[in-house]
């Protein structure tokens, strides 16, 4: 999927509106997407982005959003709505919304090397007659597994998702109001709070089975 890029400008102002529909000035927005470029025949995709966008508006890089999803040719996808997984990187103040499941931004400094284990998560909703599929890499509420970063002195970002396609966790709703049930790859199950299975348990199952991808 292409990367989403957002630049902001102090010189070219824009308008926003309050609850009384009164306008007030805000920094200008310049948002667009750009494709990654594959490096050779391997699995590395790369893009170079200018922090100083220049031009008459003196655009400055504000935020990046990198997203990926399970490809349509994977058998597990059949009959399911696939939800993308995102990372957000902020070089300035918040420019992109929090609605991408990344959690709130955590402060980091220097280059980033992000290697995360992901497990296919199937959510069955009888209420909406729908089954969704996403990649679960931990509850992004606590800081440890968040995927949004407020950057300082960062020049290079490497994202290496490790996807365990044979370690599927399934979430099923109760017959009556109550907690969801998580069914883990080893056949065990448990009631879970909110919508998050145990990431630590998934990592343990992965380790016990040799970490097969």
Mark where each language-model region is.
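A eukaryote-biased signal for long
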Residues: 83-213
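Structured domain cores in non-transmembrane regions
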Residues: 2-116
